[in-house]
Design a protein with these regions (language model features):
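An alpha-helical, amphipathic repeat domain used for nucleic-acid recognition
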Residues: 1-160
Length: 160
C-alpha cells in the first residue's frame, strides 16, 4: 500500500479524478478524441472508462473533432502552410479524413500560395530559372500542390 502523501503520478485516476484531469487537459488546449484518449491512457486508467468519459465529453460538446480540425487548419494557414502539410497535421491528430477534407475544401489554395509568395519574395515575378526554381521549392516545402505552385508563379496582378 502506498503512503497517503505519495505523488499523484503513482495513483491511477478513476471516476471524478479522471473527469477532472480530462477537463484540465481540454482547458489548456483543444484535443481530438483519439489524442485525448491517448493522453488519459498515459495515466494508467481503465481504457473502457476513458472511452466512455471521452464519448460523454464529445456528446456534451466539451470535446469536438470538428473544432479541433478547424483550429488546426486556421493555425496552419496563419503559418503559411499548404494543403499537404495541413493534411499531414490532421492525420497526426487522428482527425476523420472526411472531416479533414471538408475543412480543407473551404480554402482558396491558389490565393494562399500567391499571398505567401508575395510576402516572401515580393510582387515581381521571377524571370530567371534559378529564382523560379527557388520560389517553386519554397512553395512545395510549405505543402502546396504542383499545379498551385505553377499557377502562383505565373500569376500577375492586374493593377501592374
Amino acid at each position: 500500500m502506498s503512503p497517503p502523501n505519495a505523488p499523484s503520478a503513482t495513483r491511477i485516476p478513476t471516476g471524478a479524478r479522471l473527469r477532472q484531469l480530462a477537463f484540465a487537459y481540454l482547458g489548456r488546449r483543444e484535443y481530438s478524441k483519439q489524442m485525448l484518449i491517448d493522453k488519459l491512457a498515459e495515466t494508467g486508467a481503465d481504457l473502457n472508462a476513458i472511452q466512455q468519459l471521452v464519448d460523454e465529453l464529445a456528446d456534451s460538446c466539451y470535446q469536438s473533432d470538428s473544432r479541433m480540425a478547424s483550429m488546426t487548419v486556421r493555425s496552419n494557414l496563419r503559418r503559411g502552410r499548404g494543403q499537404a502539410r495541413i493534411k499531414q497535421d490532421l492525420k497526426k491528430y487522428a482527425i476523420d479524413p472526411a472531416l479533414a477534407a471538408a475543412e480543407l475544401a473551404a480554402t482558396d489554395w491558389l490565393q494562399q500560395a500567391i499571398q505567401l509568395r508575395m510576402k516572401k519574395f515580393g510582387a515581381t515575378l521571377p524571370t530567371e530559372a534559378k529564382e523560379k526554381a527557388r520560389q517553386f521549392r519554397f512553395l512545395q516545402y510549405r505543402g502546396f500542390d504542383l499545379d498551385i505552385c505553377r499557377q502562383a508563379l505565373a500569376w500577375q496582378d492586374e493593377d501592374e
